[in-house]
């Protein structure tokens, strides 16, 4: 079902007359993306699981890094590969694979990255277990999923959209931006409000995935520890406590809700 959804509409796609400079400028507006790029070694071997049309792969493929973009959707991979050729990015490869049977070497990667993917699988916990095996001992795993609390504003917007046949979706920053490319707005509408399968997760739940699969928890982004602004994604955060974690997630309804409610959890596979 999810495969057919993205074959019909690859996400997120590329705007007309795009360039590598423009792509990197767009990605660099995200604090998380800048911190991730800074944290990854210049010679790292990286795999992105569920890479879509490959923007993050192209952004990270700099210095001496080798980047593998893996996705189930052939149409998305074709767009990513075409963009790599057009932009002259050589140290990236796109492969068609199923997350549950990835066909990639276990323990082969310094960084395993997956954003906006696990929550669209039938069993996100099982999907994470497969993904975690791809990291080397000591390798870093970065996963982004919808947060149970931060996703609430999007769910309310979806309800309002259904009442109007999605002719009106209130307070959505992408759909409200009339300067944005029409194809981008349509792709965002489909991905955020019309997806056939969606799960939402609390920070503690995702941490349990890590501990159950031999992955040391490092931190979340945004942090669930008040006052934690170290700026080092791969450094362990200070210990948190349950009330603090809950309050932080409630706050994400305002800070992340306008962008879909995605949060990241970072861990290191135990040696």
For the regions a language model picked out, list residue spans one by one.
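Conserved alpha-helix/loop element of class I SAM-dependent methyltransferases that forms part
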Residues: 18-43
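Conserved SAM-binding loop of SAM-dependent methyltransferases across substrates and taxa
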Residues: 53-64
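Conserved SAM-binding motif I beta-strand of class I
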Residues: 66-71
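Conserved SAM-binding strand-loop segment of SAM-dependent methyltransferases
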Residues: 88-100
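A short acidic, Gly/Pro-enriched loop at the edge of an enzyme's catalytic core
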Residues: 103-111
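Rossmann-like AdoMet/SAM-dependent catalytic core
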Residues: 182-268
